[in-house]
Amino acid sequence: MGDKLSAKNYIGYTICDSANNLAFCVMGTYLATYCTDILGITGAVVTAIFWIARIWDAINDPIMGSLVQRKKPGKNGKYRPFILWSGFPLAVSAVLVYTKFTGNLTFNTIYVAATYILYGMIYTVMSVPYGSLAMVMTDKENERGNLSVARAIGGGFGNIPQLLFPIIVMTGGEDGQQMDGKRLFCAMCVVAIAMMLIYIISYSWTKEKPELVTLSNEEVHITSTLKDIIKDRAFVTMSLIGGLVIAIQMYISSANVYLFKDFYRKSGFSSIYLIISYLPLAVMIPFANKMIRKWGKKEICVVGFSISAIASLISWLGHFTNIWIYIILAFFVNLGIGFVILEVWAMCGDIVDHQEWVTGKREEATNYAVFTFMRKMGQALAAIVPLLIGAIGYDKNAIGAQTQEVLDGIYTVSTLVPFLLIVLMLVLILLYPLSKKKSEQMQKELQIQREEKLASQE
């Protein structure tokens, strides 16, 4: 339906996720360490904070999705205005999380919990309309695939703090391997300013197709929608995979802070690791759509997850003290899950389409909110890092190195859990029903279904 997306449209959509990820990656990588090492909060309490935030998300996300779905389109569209409405508050809330006022442990614990939950709520206000925006920009499968790749690229650029922060903020302590809280706060202020500027450009360069907005402008009954979702094997399995893939990414990022700082004693290598981990994505980008047309999304994921599972198993069993062997194996882990990282949002679109196909209703905002909630549950799963690190006896006040027992525990924590999560993803993708053949059938029948609905509304 309608004209093709322009390069400007793709760029506008891409950079919005860059802005989102500028703060998001810092939360996933450094918040646990900030809480334990700067604020002095125990690992168990940090994990509890993350889980409380996710419990609130279980209530907040579906409600937000239904509210967005009910919103009537204005002159600037249905979803685009949220980029500005929520973008600036999101940037400010990210800074507030890393603002330390006193040395009082109780106050700091309550404050960081409150600001983190606030950040999560505003992130939902941003992410649900932003994700839904892709579904009303185009209904063409190849363009949706391109938007998903574009979003992955944008998210990758948003990980720039992971490249620079080890150099900027990991400079404290006698050995220069500890986090500096003041530097982290200043760096977050710079990040927030960049986010605001990017949101302005993104809003200006994106567009919505009125006919697709019309299809999505249906009355929402959240209870019946959730019942439909629970009965939909495609939606359930892909939502779980979406949550697990972000759990793996964030878990590894968070665990690597301890692994590189304590086990390998080379904090700066986290930047090298990040570059190596994104190489598979860079290699795949030009070929993603060709791969989909030839083999299908599910089929590619089955092979990819198998590669990742083997590489992560070797990494765990090998207990490698050579950091380069660990990084090389990480390349293959990321190679295997790279396709789903690139195409996760296109596959989200597929399961929204599947819901429309089987129910006759198109409720992308509510559907997307549920999918986003599962990804937030993935974040919560990744939040067990400080709990596990504390359980193995990690001492943040240790003079010099941790004990060998703790160091071995850090390595196991960093490699065993990702292996188990990847195996679980492999099982789920085998259960996912949308094969290449089934997806093609769905799109053909949906096209007829939509044309009939639009004709009946004229």
Residue ranges and their predicted role:
Residues 2-458:
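Membrane-embedded alpha-helical bundles of multi-pass transporters/translocases
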